[in-house]
Amino acid sequence: MAIKAEEISALIKEQIENYQQQLAVEEVGTVTYVGDGIARAHGLENAMSGELVEFSNGSYGMAQNLETNDVGIIILGDFETIREGDKVQRTGKIMEVPVGEALIGRVVNPLGQPLDGLGEIKTDKTRPVEATAPGVMQRQSVAEPMQTGLKAIDALVPIGRGQRELVIGDRKTGKTSIAIDTIINQKGQDVICIYVAIGQKESTVRNQVETLRKFGALDYTIVVTAGASQPAPLLYIAPYAGTAMGEEFMYNGKHVLIIFDDLSKQAVAYRELSLLLRRPPGREAYPGDVFYLHSRLLERAAKLSDELGGGSMTALPFVETQAGDISAYIPTNVISITDGQIFLESDLFYAGTRPAVDAGLSVSRVGGSAQIKAMKKVAGTLRLDLASYRELEAFTQFGSDLDAATQAKLNRGRRTVEILKQKLHAPLPVEKQVLILYALTHGFLDSVSVDKILHFEQDLFDYFDGKHADLLETIRTTKDLPDTDALDAAITEFSEMFAAANNSGDSAKEALEKIDNA
């Protein structure tokens, strides 16, 4: 084959015409120290705070300390194969996580990588883990209820969509159970739930995921987990990653419930990183910006204005106390940031009152305006009545001479405590909560012995489901009480049957069947 000089000449001319003088400028530094999830690098002169950097082994890190001679970096991945002298380069980006519908029903780590063995997550959408919270004019007042399905919370310390409500208590007082029950209760409510597990045992998270799957709640839930065995940087960014995933739905007009379980462990991880990065320690060895750590996270939960789509993100941060001390550093910080707190008391929990909500120390600052009318009417003074009952109960230990009014208050208080008890993973629809609280506050339970209260409740629900479903439907659709005469008549009829059944030894259900057959 003959080589033609003209063709070679034309090719050379084409190459010369297409030649562009380009220089790729990359800022590369050298690792001078690595260990315990952090690294120091020299030579990244123009690195920005929070910027993503890439190590030669493919791991990423986030620039945290910008000092004269070097940059302190937290490593988001495998740091055991990084060596002193390795190269590290800037990416010019901040950290982002995958977001979108593809994450629903999945278990992921804080980097958005799947942990459930169900294959890769097919989404091309990402959001930065750190984002500016909505401003004052981008928000609106909390006005819609976020029903937890727990009588003790929906009646005493109601939560609204877009609210931040702290759940605080010692270990093993039922904080996580409240989270799981609240998620289960969102079934059919068009709410996306995000459960962020920080520093928990892998076996515990597995049990929670299986519980959600069993009740069909995983169909609308994203689980973000940074286990106890994970490096501190992953525990630190886990809540921000979960919030970024929630913001994608919130800014598209949807309603989101995000649960941080728990922020105490995140604060401990941040303290560890700060001390390793040689930042000056403050109270309890936490760094000076530990308040900002949580405030910038929780401020991202909001009820957006109608101009922005009217979406919302409700945050339930959890904080663990030591021996019930809510005046410690992290608890007081988070209490001051949130719109109220639900305090779980270990003494109540071990006495069998579950959920162990302490009515005296728990408060919801904005949730009252989100309660439905029916619940406001039946539960208006319930929290104060319960708190005064606790005080009276303490005084009665000193003497037995009680006037009739005090005795009546004590009797009503004992029945209130019993009614607010609830089985695990059995959230109640709001219309049934209203029904039993109406029966309580209008004296229908005063003649029922305390040990029969929960039987009365269950049989009352069965009776109304079978005979007066229209009254329950009225509460559900109108959000208000039905005709009180009809409601009183129905409850009175059931109460008489229940009393007769107790006298004959039948259950109320059996008595009802006998009446139907007759």
From Swiss-Prot:
InterPro entries: ATP_synth_asu-like_sf (IPR023366), ATP_synth_asu_C (IPR000793), ATP_synth_asu_C_sf (IPR038376), ATP_synth_F1_a_nt-bd_dom (IPR033732), ATP_synth_F1_asu (IPR005294), ATPase_a/bsu_AS (IPR020003), ATPase_F1/V1/A1_a/bsu_N (IPR004100), ATPase_F1/V1/A1_a/bsu_N_sf (IPR036121). Gene3D superfamilies: 2.40.30.20, ATP synthase alpha/beta chain, C-terminal domain, P-loop containing nucleotide triphosphate hydrolases. ATP binds at G169, D170, R171, K172, T173, G174, K175, T176. Pfam families: ATP-synt_ab (PF00006), ATP-synt_ab_C (PF00306), ATP-synt_ab_N (PF02874). Keywords: ATP synthesis, ATP-binding, Cell membrane, CF(1), Hydrogen ion transport, Ion transport, Membrane, Nucleotide-binding, Translocase, Transport. GO terms for cellular component: plasma membrane; proton-transporting ATP synthase complex. Its EC number is 7.1.2.2. It comes from the Bacteria. The record marks S362 as: Required for activity. It is a peripheral membrane protein. It catalyses: ATP + H2O + 4 H(+)(in) = ADP + phosphate + 5 H(+)(out). GO terms for molecular function: ADP binding; ATP binding; proton-transporting ATP synthase activity, rotational mechanism. It is found in: Cell membrane. PROSITE patterns: ATPASE_ALPHA_BETA (PS00152). CDD domains: ATP-synt_F1_alpha_C, ATP-synt_F1_alpha_N, F1-ATPase_alpha_CD. Belongs to the ATPase alpha/beta chains family. NCBIfam families: atpA, PRK13343.1. PANTHER family: ATP SYNTHASE SUBUNIT ALPHA, MITOCHONDRIAL. Produces ATP from ADP in the presence of a proton gradient across the membrane. The alpha chain is a regulatory subunit. F-type ATPases have 2 components, CF(1) - the catalytic core - and CF(0) - the membrane proton channel. CF(1) has five subunits: alpha(3), beta(3), gamma(1), delta(1), epsilon(1). CF(0) has three main subunits: a(1), b(2) and c(9-12). The alpha and beta chains form an alternating ring which encloses part of the gamma chain. CF(1) is attached to CF(0) by a central stalk formed by the gamma and epsilon chains, while a peripheral stalk is formed by the delta and b chains. This is ATP synthase subunit alpha.
